[in-house]
Amino acid sequence: MAKAKFERTKPHVNIGTIGHVDHGKTSLTAAITMVLGKDNKDIKVKKYDEIDAAPEEKERGITISTAHVEYETKSRHYAHVDCPGHADYVKNMITGAAQMDGAILVVSAADGPMPQTREHILLAKQVGVPKMVVFLNKVDMVDDPDLLELVEMEVRELLSKYDFPGDEIPIIRGSALQALEGKPEGEKAIHELMDAVDSYIPQPIRETEKPFLMPIEDVFSISGRGTVVTGRIEAGKVKVGEAVEIVGIKATQTSTCTGVEMFRKLLDSGEAGDNVGILLRGIDREAVQRGQVLAKPGSITPHDEFEAEVYVLSKDEGGRHTPFTNNYRPQFYFRTTDVTGTIELPADKQMVMPGDNATFKVKLISPIAMQQGLKFSIREGGRTVGAGVVSKVIN
């Protein structure tokens, strides 16, 4: 089936619903499509059952169920992800299968914050979701206005505890069910929520506007011309004549881009998404290797120690059959290469079981160009046993 092409006249933002099981994430997702769909016939209205029966997808060998819906407001176009199960959220956020520029945290006014509310806020912080808006759902089930105030205070305190600005985050009260039933107060709350999302969730920086970065996949020597590195430009742009740094594994080197080639044609520049060969001035073939990155000078630094948020594959997903303990030494696969590293578990954690998610420190045997948010796989004998994201660079 041919996919309908979306008119890209409006800025695009990726968003998702997070929160505790049964607090109404999927109902809210359905309600948003329904309420916005009334004013805009291009929006596909999705029913609860269609969203809940999310198809399974594989991302880096991990099975994740995710529902994708799209809708638009007057000012933006949104791609929205909703996951049926808690484990799907954990996997989704860690692997970045569905990148989120912002989130809608759904909290049931009848229950207040619950364990998964906490875990999803923490995960959002660890994986670098920049901002979130709160939808206090099921307010039709709460008669006491003081109780609503109390729940709202509790949510704000929880957000602040995990370094989100709890005092300024918009909290919208409503009922997804009332919106689905077409009640005016229900629909009004959905419009309020989307206004808050439009204004509070920042416009993401496009890949082409970020500093230049290209993971090196291969290195060639061309007689009479010098050394050529190939790869796919991950971010930014590079022009002929610009200075670049070669970062990671060895000491950082500086060079100049003297040529950009794509499909055997010479170009003046390359940008995010292009598969290119870049000619480097004054660099020996032996001085560069796969696993390093080419970057705008000063934009990224090499590190061999970091803290990570990791999902460990279950046995059914082809992961380990047994838990691992402190000082476990697998391979960490960053961008294009494997680097051996040692894991240091937190003092209160004896082991990590297959199917778990955990936070721990890693010490690599050689430094890799990294910053918060970099994704990696954990491998053992060539098979993937985990997926992670750098939550904090240590040195």
From Swiss-Prot:
Record-level GO cellular component terms: cytoplasm
GO molecular function, one term: GTPase activity
Family: Belongs to the TRAFAC class translation factor GTPase superfamily. Classic translation factor GTPase family. EF-Tu/EF-1A subfamily.
Principal place of residence: cytoplasm
Name of the gene this protein is made from: tuf
Protein's UniProt keywords contain Amino-acid biosynthesis: no
Ranges for domain tr-type G: 10-205
G5: region residues: 175-177
NCBIfam families in the record: EF-Tu, PRK00049.1, PRK12735.1, PRK12736.1, small_GTP
Region (G1): 19-26
Segments of this protein annotated with the region G2: 61-65
Listed name of the protein: Elongation factor Tu
Keyword GTP-binding in annotation: yes
Oligomeric form and interacting partners: Monomer.
Keywords assigned by UniProt, alphabetized: Cytoplasm, Elongation factor, GTP-binding, Hydrolase, Magnesium, Metal-binding, Nucleotide-binding, Protein biosynthesis
Binding site for GTP: 19-26, 82-86, 137-140
